Amino acid sequence: MELTSVSPEQRGAHSQRISPSRLQVARLRRGLTKADLANRIGVSPSTLSKWEADGPPTSRVATLLGDLASTLDFPPAFFTADEVDIPSLEHTLFRAGSRATQRQKLAGISSGVNAKILLKWLRSHFNYPSPDIPDLTGMAPAEAARYVRSIWALGDSPIPNSVQLAESKGVAVIGLPPAASAVDAFSIWEDDQPFIFLARRLTPEGSRFDLAHELGHLLLHSKSDPDTPTDREDEANKFASEFLIPTDVIHANLRLHPSLDDILRLKFKLKVSAMAALLAVFNADKLSDRQFRQYLGILSSRGFRTSEPGSDLQYERSRVFDFVFSSEGGQSARSIADATHIPVQDLHFLTLNAAASALPGPEPTHPSARPSPSSHRPNLRIVKS
């Protein structure tokens, strides 16, 4: 007879219960349908549906934990921890809208659940900034952008590191995994905590606009009825444009009928995309319809629809996660993974690549791994025990 060792998780499995909600979160995070997972672990889809509603029978826990861990790449302890709340798909506004599939949106939602687990751990170890986001429901988007610039003492200067600015106001800025990259970005309120989720698949300039767009949602739509027939995406876009490219700055820097080179200089100054700058200049009545179409065609032919030629802007880093993984913060990706039961690779995405510096091996070469300093930094301190 062949003898094998038994892990502590397996020894205690008979007294454990698999959380239905965590089972669902892990499945959605891996982009699997119920039929997909059921087939991989050898049960019927109806059985899996029952398990996601009521949990598997305790007699199955011992063997099922191993199957789920190997199939979904989550540690066994993840499935037996406390239940979690899964945000409603219908009440979550996605930046990509109809461009993203439901499976991709659900992968984003499940990442949101893991982000909440991570934030709970952060709050238990660090003095995390409290939310300081005013409720501007009903205010015109451009007016709201100017108001926020005023109360946050930003003046007419280019917005600095927007990730660190949001974090300094208590917003948890979280990265999305590749499985949800088509979502672009989304934001939610969970237990009075604002979250912004970002996918970094295009340009740093686009990522800054995505964050400003989601900040607009948090400011303008936190108290409004999600079923109210209003164009929230358009309002968030208008907020983001005025927040990043103030009309007063356009008038101060550009004459009537500016050249395309003038607009590109403003684009680099404000750290925004060429297309966003062109549209803002047009909306500020600086260009005729004919000029706008002409410049749009030129930018498209130069590749500005999908990239930012000539830009050396780097993806903005999180001050929160950089501190957590610093020598002062004293944490590693493995230590947090062990404490939260979130896989290390998932932490890498959630922390906007900051966890990569805590992984063994060479430093990542992705642009988002490079630092982007900012004066707007959250007051993060270690909680003394």
What are these regions (language model features)?
Residues 1-385:
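Active-site hotspot residues in diverse enzymes, especially metal/ion-binding acidic/histidine motifs
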